[in-house]
Amino acid sequence: MAIKKYKPITNGRRNMTSLDFAEITKTTPEKSLLKPLPKKAGRNNQGKLTVRHHGGGHKRQYRVIDFKRNKDGINAKVDSIQYDPNRSANIALVVYADGEKRYIIAPKGLEVGQIVESGAEADIKVGNALPLQNIPVGTVVHNIELKPGKGGQIARSAGASAQVLGKEGKYVLIRLRSGEVRMILSTCRATIGQVGNLQHELVNVGKAGRSRWKGIRPTVRGSVMNPNDHPHGGGEGRAPIGRPSPMSPWGKPTLGKKTRRGKKSSDKLIVRGRKKK
């Protein structure tokens, strides 16, 4: 999809861009694949705020996506490419030969009328899902499982992909976009190709109200708060932090502090860590 620019008729329109949605072929979703999506506003089941900057936004319905791709041996025809408000990638409605309909993540190059399939015998073609042990080295993949049968968890957002680097025993080496090289069980499934909607990262929101439509609330700096609200708060004028390192609102070190849990069981599966920026 191409990037659409706007004339600067207002301050909000100046520098604003959006996608032209040329790839979208159908605007109304499949009703049988919709579920209600109640607003949480960043609260947990106790009503306590657990995620800041969430709240409001346009009403949405959840599209049930087939991340498992476990319907083997039956061809499916791509019926339409649709917009999904719950993710950055577009989704494709596929209709199987037995009449069942499912949504899948729409990879780059997938077209209406194309046939997709899943299973160990599937061809190495964009949109097909296979076990990693059946995918040739060097192939670009997305929607990768971490546990067999659990469904794809890695490389699902717009433009995301990973590459098969090699095979060692019951594991397959995968290089992620972060530069991390990881071992994944060869029986886990992945889908061929790169996730579509590559231009998504180039969109300029343009104004605060557009973020509010998405349910994103303002982020306030700690330095402009009072000392009872944030460790950075207080002082006269633009005062420094007054601490050895930046702190989170709860007084924990942040901005560079490692947050991954130590001695995690999957550490032994990471061959090379992600690249430093």
Swiss-Prot record:
Q: Does the keyword Ligase apply?
A: no
PROSITE patterns documented for this protein: RIBOSOMAL_L2
Quote the Pfam families the UniProt record gives: Ribosomal_L2, Ribosomal_L2_C
Q: Which residues form a coiled coil?
A: none
Gene Ontology process terms (BP): cytoplasmic translation
Q: Which GO terms describe its molecular function?
A: RNA binding; rRNA binding; structural constituent of ribosome; transferase activity
Q: Cellular component per GO?
A: large ribosomal subunit
Q: Which Gene3D superfamilies match?
A: 2.30.30.30, Nucleic acid-binding proteins (2.40.50.140), Ribosomal protein L2, domain 3 (4.10.950.10)
Q: Where is this region: Disordered?
A: 36-55, 213-277
SMART domains xref list: Ribosomal_L2, Ribosomal_L2_C
Q: Which UniProt keywords apply?
A: Ribonucleoprotein, Ribosomal protein, RNA-binding, rRNA-binding
Function of this protein?
One of the primary rRNA binding proteins. Required for association of the 30S and 50S subunits to form the 70S ribosome, for tRNA binding and peptide bond formation. It has been suggested to have peptidyltransferase activity; this is somewhat controversial. Makes several contacts with the 16S rRNA in the 70S ribosome.
The entry assigns this protein to a family as follows: Belongs to the universal ribosomal protein uL2 family.
**Assembly and interaction partners:** Part of the 50S ribosomal subunit. Forms a bridge to the 30S subunit in the 70S ribosome.
Record NCBIfam families: rplB_bact
Tell me what this protein is called: Large ribosomal subunit protein uL2
Give the originating organism: Staphylococcus aureus (strain NCTC 8325 / PS 47)
